[in-house]
Amino acid sequence: RPPMMLAGMTPTTVDPAIVAAAANGRHWAELAGGGQVTPELLETHIAQLTDMLEPGINAQFNSMFLDPYLWKMQIGGKRLVPKARANVITAGIPEKDEAVALVKELMRDGFPWIAFKPGAIKQVNSVLAIAKEVPELPIIIQIEGGVAGGHHSWEDLDELLIATYGK
């Protein structure tokens, strides 16, 4: 894949058309879960995205752990998100035991990898601890800094990378 990603970010990647365009261009592309606020909207957008993707092409789903309503609807109890190529867990990191159980469950459901989007040194370390518990599944870390006003982080990206890169 080209070295560029269309990361999930509400409101931009709530629309399946931009996600499909990037994915069909062979880029990592994420449908933003933050704007999928009802089961009907989520199902409509997933169906539209599926129709727009070329054969053999897939997209990832960006789920917001911080929002209990969306998390439960999309990933938790109702599990409305079908198999995507990956699930990106953002806006918070579950506790280690909960995260390991979730990763194993998603792996059993056919997700070939899981991504986390930590925005703090402590969160990066948490994701590394989670990854050590599930060596059979690739865990992707998408580190976010706080330059954009702290939406996902208040920490400087350079400091995050310097403090965690060697781990």
Can you say where each PLM-predicted feature lies in the sequence?
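Active-site entrance/lid segments in N-terminal catalytic domains of soluble metabolic enzymes
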Residues: 1-166
